[in-house]
Amino acid sequence: MCKETVTGCIDEYFEYKFGRLDYRSLKFEHIHLDIDNYQGNAVINYNEAKYPFTRIIEHKHFEFGKQPSTIITKEYPQEYTPSDEPYYPINDEKNLKCFNKYKLLAEKDSRVIFGGRLGQYAYFDMDDTIASAILLTKKKLSI
């Protein structure tokens, strides 16, 4: 039997049968700077309340660029609205109750595998995302 993998929002997949799940979104600000180096690293996270952004990405450091200028991206947390891109699930009692209804519905459909942050309504770091995908694939495909 052919299986479909869904990594999008599980509530959207089921046409919001039990209501909408809440998410957190992001806003990105891209800035070109006429300096050769801004922060010396590709990514620096800012978790102190005094900063309005959560991280700054300096793209040239992913490829060890030697350009005379640089581009940075500041990432800001943002309330989610249906017209925004959902990035992170909101892990609270109300949303977990709603998600569990969708999860039960998903378990009844053997043709679909739900994965990732939005499909499993869980926060994953990248290493956890890869590990979860491998584990889920082995389990669902019996390999």
Question: What does each model-found stretch correspond to?
Answer:
Residues 1, 7-8:
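Short, well-ordered coil/turn residues at beta-beta hairpins
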Residues 2, 12-143:
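C-terminal segments that line or cap access tunnels to active or ligand-binding sites in enzymes
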